[in-house]
UniProtKB/Swiss-Prot annotation:
Protein encoded by which gene: rplK
One of the record's GO cellular component terms: cytosolic large ribosomal subunit
Keyword Ribosomal protein assigned: yes
Complexes and interactors: Part of the ribosomal stalk of the 50S ribosomal subunit. Interacts with L10 and the large rRNA to form the base of the stalk. L10 forms an elongated spine to which L12 dimers bind in a sequential fashion forming a multimeric L10(L12)X complex.
GO molecular function: large ribosomal subunit rRNA binding; structural constituent of ribosome
Lineage, broadest ranks: Bacteria, Bacillati, Bacillota, Clostridia, Eubacteriales
Pfam families recorded: Ribosomal_L11 (PF00298), Ribosomal_L11_N (PF03946)
Protein name, per record: Large ribosomal subunit protein uL11
Species this chain originates from: Ruminiclostridium cellulolyticum (strain ATCC 35319 / DSM 5812 / JCM 6584 / H10) (Clostridium cellulolyticum)
GO BP, sorted A to Z: translation
SUPFAM superfamilies per record: Ribosomal L11/L12e N-terminal domain, Ribosomal protein L11, C-terminal domain
Length: 141
């Protein structure tokens, strides 16, 4: 029989840098999970993605054990990395902070495809291009 699920915890943690400090410690502590066990396992799984923020969904079971699924980094993080910028524009309609080519947007869309609610890579590319525009990044053909 399957284990009884006590709850889910969704976090965004820098790859390879999970520590028992907030936000990880308090979020897992209230469910009674072994925080160090999670941190070690997460850091091992995400060591290759250093520098990126990794969303993780932790499933906590009634016996206080856990399992977790890592997702692809948020589109905004991937766009900032591709454009080599610190943050998006505060006024995206007026101030443009960078330019990105459609090919680069397509590569990001292909990387994000498993986590996006899109039927095709073209649809995913449009989603990522929209995110770029809302950050003040100009998408050039």
């Amino acid at each position: 029989m399957a284990k009884k699920i006590a709850g889910y915890v969704k976090l965004q943690i820098p790859a390879g840098k999970a520590t028992p400090a907030p936000p990880v410690g308090p979020a897992l502590g209230q469910h009674g999970v072994n925080i160090m066990g999670f941190c070690k396992e997460f850091n091992e799984r995400t060591a290759k993605d250093a520098g990126l923020v990794i969303p993780v969904v932790i499933t906590v079971y009634a016996d206080r054990s856990f399992s977790f699924i890592t997702k692809t980094p948020p589109a905004a993080v991937l766009l900032k990395k591709a454009c080599k910028i610190e943050s998006g524009s505060g006024k995206p309609n007026k101030d443009k902070v960078a330019k990105i080519t459609m090919d680069e947007v397509r590569k990001i869309a292909e990387q994000k495809m498993p986590d996006l609610n899109a039927a095709s890579v073209d649809a995913a590319t449009k989603m990522i291009a929209g995110t770029a525009r809302s950050m003040g990044i100009v998408v050039v053909e």
